Amino acid sequence: MGEHRPFDEKQRKAIEAFCENYNVVVYVNHLSNYHGKYSIQGNLLVACGGMKKLHPDILITIGGQTGDYPLYGALNGLSDMEHWRVAEDGALVDTYSRLTKVFECPDYFFFNRLAGVHLCGHSYYEKWIQLEEMLNRNIQLPFSNLYVAQQLYKEIPSCSIVNYAILNSLRCWNYFPLDPSIQGYANVAAFGIDGCNSMLIGESMNTDELCFIITGDLAFFYDMNALGIRHIKKNVRIILINNGGGAEFKIMTDAWKEDVHVADFISANGHNGSAKGWAENCGFIYFSATDESSFEKCKVNLISRSDKPIILEVFTYVDNEKKANDLILASNRISSKTDNIKALIKNVLGEKGTDVLKKIIIT
């Protein structure tokens, strides 16, 4: 399920009835806004290699974009899989290069029509759950966006609305499950940076529940003028992860770091800017954290009611952002038989020996 408005009871029952009759799992993330039976937030599981053991025969997609790069990488590499798209617009959106059928209808209509009366086993869902329960999210992480997500995901008040100025924030927070009453949104079509603060503030006008956004320094400063909007409500909460300029670009291009020095192409790299002056001038309560101790002191204020909107600026280092992501993936890595054989060869031959073997095989 991609980005979707919260499902009503009719939609949820149709999906659950469909699931009862087929051996399926409903893969969701925070943007899906679905928490029905047979659903699983499997982002961390897939990022750790879980799809090697969970190969689907048919993929049915509903909703908009997912912003889920681990899922895209895993599914795009599968050869013997059908992709069915269910959408009222009937558009040919072949995200995973496996599109075979398009059902031009509402998702409720599709699931309701295909829901039968013959119940079946659910071994596929049980396999997902078995692997999911093996994951360890409670590992020691360096101070980073991922650390903030790890410390806050159980603390966000029920019925809150959480926004993600993707890509880094969406990935980090998708590793951790939130309370089912919490709604999630992101500007995925604009890849997060366009108007994320403005969206949050507009959204907060329609509710009295706490409205959060987890954003990076580049996305925040790109839309900083939104903080100057008059009459911003006191339910606004901004968590600004300031890593000094474009950590996500460096994480995503790590495999090329020897050939391309990405920092040379990030105009805001090393900007040394802070939101403090602007936030306070716009009437926000401002807190900052530079380490675990100072973050712990600010955390309670962030998730509590207040008389003014709040911004928490968390100063991190680019290296820690990458280390944190590498750590949580390495700690939960799911290996196939092929991976184990490759690891054995590498241990025996070493890096140089493995490179020589690759050249021999290629030639």
Where are these regions (language model features)?
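Glycine-rich, acidic loop regions that bind phosphate or pyrophosphate groups
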Residues: Y27-I129, R230-H231, I238, G244, ...
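Glycine-rich, anion-gripping cofactor-binding loops and their flanking helix/strand elements
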Residues: G2-W84, D179-T207, F221-M224, T290-S293
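Alpha-helical scaffold segments in soluble metabolic enzymes
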Residues: A17, G73, R113, Q150-E155, ...
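Short acidic/His/Gly/Ser-rich catalytic and metal-binding motifs that mark active-site loops
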Residues: G36, L131, R171-N174, A247-K250
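Short glycine-rich anion-binding loops that position phosphate/pyrophosphate groups of nucleotides
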Residues: E3-P6, L31-S32, G63-G67, D89, ...
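Thiamine diphosphate
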Residues: Y175-T363
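Structural motif
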Residues: I58, I161, L210-F212
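Phosphate/pyrophosphate-binding active-site segments
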Residues: N76-N168, E292-T363
